[in-house]
């Protein structure tokens, strides 16, 4: 398969490109592009499909509610996607920010082509920043009569795309961060996972602790509507209009994907999926679901073309309305967490009212983007002083935890799930981080599910894992030459009593990484992070 620039590298470099553009003073804005492709929409007559009839039977007694299943394990998340693609009869719609060039992405592409060969319509919408230079493969796939591929907010230069960051920074630094996967307009998955090994427990070195939710019924139709909004936007450009060079034939691409799926690595990974309980549930049509009402919220794609301060196209105000009534507890997981003064103030208000506020984010050692950690670090003392319980994910579980059972499938972990549980009654799952980039610059999607059972189970599981997978931060008063001052400490609460892991210094982070975070923290770039 073709291997070009790595999407993970692209993700890490974006904050630094933003910084460079800011220093150079480039802030050009573009006129909205013209529509380049014919419109197409979700197929509505899919009730007769295998999925449609199965879901209709299971939803009979649930009064227009949707059925939900959290996918907190990477293997489960990939297995469900493969089985849904195998079951597809009418359509598959995929929207993602990153599309790696590795074992799981090639398996994913292989299953898409197999579905297309059966007559299933496939629409694949990728942000142009995150496909890893795989345009020959993607354009070849798009030559299939049943496959369409569009790139969102494409760069004008196909050879040096980052150059656009310097000449058209205000638009090209803003990306489509949504992740959706919908089959036959009947079942849909949204959440934090892109397409690649680190998201699906296939990378032995680094694994993302992530979360998706599978939803069937009315929820799927809402996700289809969001997909259509992006697919038919002028920023979604067919790959054939962008890639003009010679392509591998569809036959050659099909053979390459088949060969990749039969490789030793792919077969070893697929073998790990066969023993999953969720596989048996799906094949026996006995998937355990939580039936509940939900609200789907997403940014309009016009967000990328308007002033960041104009929130008319933003999902954040709607999300705040859905989650503003807090009584007892807020559990927040955000891998990239830069709360700003307003959110710190809201946390303080909740604490004054007697509510518990707990936040889990990445430690510097676990964070894959040091620049983002720099923005977050400024707020730690204020968060703790406001009464927030602040936890940071370790890059590895505690020594007394059985690593063979850890949920990430890798030797090192990085948090990537974006979820919130409010009063153990409502749960948010989506692609949105609590940082300025997600709120004001990129586009995002998420769902608020009103289910005490689902939210309660998620909260209990989350709190049970914390002591072995995260450090708790506290402020202690220390004395020195210039008087007393507050100092951060990191605690391992998996021991009894808790032990201090580090005092005043980011644990398990090397000197260079600490310097990066410190230096970027001196610069006025928080709004870009």
Locate the predicted segments by residue.
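N-terminal secretory signal peptides that target proteins for export/translocation
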Residues: 1-11
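ATP-binding N-terminal substructure of ATP-dependent carboxylate-amine bond-forming enzymes
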Residues: 2, 15, 39
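Charged, low-complexity intrinsically disordered terminal segments
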Residues: 28-177, 183-529
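Bacterial N-terminal signal peptides
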Residues: 14-25
């Amino acid at each position: 398969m073709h291997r070009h620039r790595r999407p993970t590298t692209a993700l890490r470099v974006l904050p630094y490109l933003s910084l460079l553009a800011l220093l150079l003073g480039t802030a050009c804005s573009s006129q909205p592009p013209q529509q380049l492709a014919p419109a197409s929409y979700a197929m509505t007559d899919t009730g007769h499909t295998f999925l449609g009839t199965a879901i209709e039977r299971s939803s009979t007694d649930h009064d227009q509610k949707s059925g939900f299943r959290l996918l907190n394990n990477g293997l489960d998340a990939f297995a469900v996607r493969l089985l849904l693609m195998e079951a597809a009869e009418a359509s598959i719609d995929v929207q993602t920010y990153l599309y790696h060039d590795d074992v799981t992405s090639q398996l994913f592409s292989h299953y898409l082509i197999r579905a297309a060969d059966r007559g299933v319509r496939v629409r694949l919408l990728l942000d142009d920043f995150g496909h890893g230079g795989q345009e020959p493969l993607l354009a070849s796939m798009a030559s299939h009569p049943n496959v369409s591929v569009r790139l969102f907010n494409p760069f004008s230069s196909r050879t040096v795309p980052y150059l656009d960051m310097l000449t058209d920074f205000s638009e090209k630094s803003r990306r489509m961060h949504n992740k959706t996967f919908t089959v036959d307009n009947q079942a849909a998955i949204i959440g934090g996972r892109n397409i690649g090994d680190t998201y699906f427990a296939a990378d032995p070195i680094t694994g993302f602790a992530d979360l998706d939710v599978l939803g069937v019924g009315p929820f799927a139709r809402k996700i289809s509507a969001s997909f259509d909004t992006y697919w038919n936007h002028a920023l979604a450009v067919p790959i054939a209009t962008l890639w003009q060079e010679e392509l591998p034939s569809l036959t050659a691409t099909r053979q390459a994907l088949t060969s990749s799926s039969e490789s030793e690595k792919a077969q070893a990974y697929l073998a790990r999926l066969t023993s999953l309980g969720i596989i048996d549930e799906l094949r026996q049509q006995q998937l355990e679901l939580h039936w509940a009402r939900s609200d789907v919220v997403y940014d309009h794609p016009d967000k990328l073309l308007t002033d960041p301060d104009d929130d008319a196209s933003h999902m954040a105000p709607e999300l705040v309305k859905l989650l503003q009534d807090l009584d007892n507890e807020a559990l927040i997981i955000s891998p990239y967490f830069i709360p700003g003064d307003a959110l710190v103030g809201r946390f303080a208000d909740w604490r004054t009212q007697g509510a518990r506020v707990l936040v889990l984010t990445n430690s510097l050692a676990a964070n894959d983007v040091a620049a983002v950690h720099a923005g977050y670090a400024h707020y730690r003392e204020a968060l703790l002083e406001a009464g927030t319980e602040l936890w940071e994910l370790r890059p590895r579980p505690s020594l007394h935890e059985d690593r063979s059972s850890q949920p990430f499938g890798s030797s090192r972990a990085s948090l990537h799930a974006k979820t919130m549980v409010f009063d153990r009654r409502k749960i948010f799952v989506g692609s949105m981080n609590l940082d300025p980039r997600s709120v004001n610059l990129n586009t995002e999607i998420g769902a608020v599910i009103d289910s005490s059972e689902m939210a309660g189970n998620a909260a209990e599981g989350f709190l049970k894992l914390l002591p072995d997978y995260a450090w708790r931060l506290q402020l202690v008063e220390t004395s020195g030459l210039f008087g007393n001052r507050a100092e951060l400490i990191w605690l391992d609460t998996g021991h009894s009593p808790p032990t201090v892991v580090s005092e005043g210094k980011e644990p398990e982070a090397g000197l260079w990484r600490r310097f990066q975070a410190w230096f970027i923290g001196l610069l006025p770039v928080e709004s870009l992070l």
